[in-house]
């Protein structure tokens, strides 16, 4: 009997490890989606640079999270013999891999907002600071109960802050940090002339659409596999993700007047918003969440670009920042049993965490993206923006060879 129990435990640990590894690979693939979404949106002269930044950001994120960030969030390090790390089929290692892919999404989100003008080196430095210190602080607060915030919310409002797959912890944080960076860098040269918006059309709608589809597919790993064990898997999460994606698509199709950029970002808005409550909502609540998110994205993107003159290239603040905030609040609404949800969530806790988080996220943006005081050090020269960052970098390399 003991041998049978031991064999069952080995099977369970092995299955859970494989399960979360597959989730990590699916979310890792989403970074290809981030890359192609940015490549399709920026101008042709900046496509190669966009690809290079996403991959480089991921590499820096992996180092920062492995050596510092994961320890800050969970108090876990990997400075142990390999024999100790392979306990339970190495589940702890693969869990790190899975959560790393979430952490690395933050700089990928920010990259889309500051595209075509941020300098390569300073952006990588900001990535290291954010993934090592800023993101793990918020991650630990919500997902590891650090500093007693969750206990306080539970005592005060009857339930802790609930964010199953990161509407707030990942997406809202990334979106608000991106807004801080966009405001810090200013708009691209030529984006506004005499106070009016100058159109800068996406370079490739097919690449933009490809990026959107890669993200949509990977998102089911992002949400469903946030259960982190086979025993925790719920078909409710999958269907809620599907219907929120559909809701975002329909809203952006109707309100965005068939604009392909809006159409392919609408489903992403719905998926961002449903992350928080995908394990609690009724599918109709998830559909409503996606509909609101799609409409919110179209309205906010238009307002930021035209009315407020904020040059957020991919619209990451509306998409991730605002829709992420809406997702946290929607979880508190549609997660209630009275509206068909599973319950165990408090609207007060969801709103309170957002009010506290907004100020700190802005401070984190100024601390990470705003560490370097001089705009010239953070932003490419006018020649780089006009000719394209990649071409200018090649010219500098040729001049060094000639010298």
Regions found by a protein language model. Give the residues of each.
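Acidic, glutamate-rich low-complexity segments that are typically intrinsically disordered
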Residues: 357-403
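Glycine- and aromatic-enriched membrane alpha-helices
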Residues: 2-359, 403
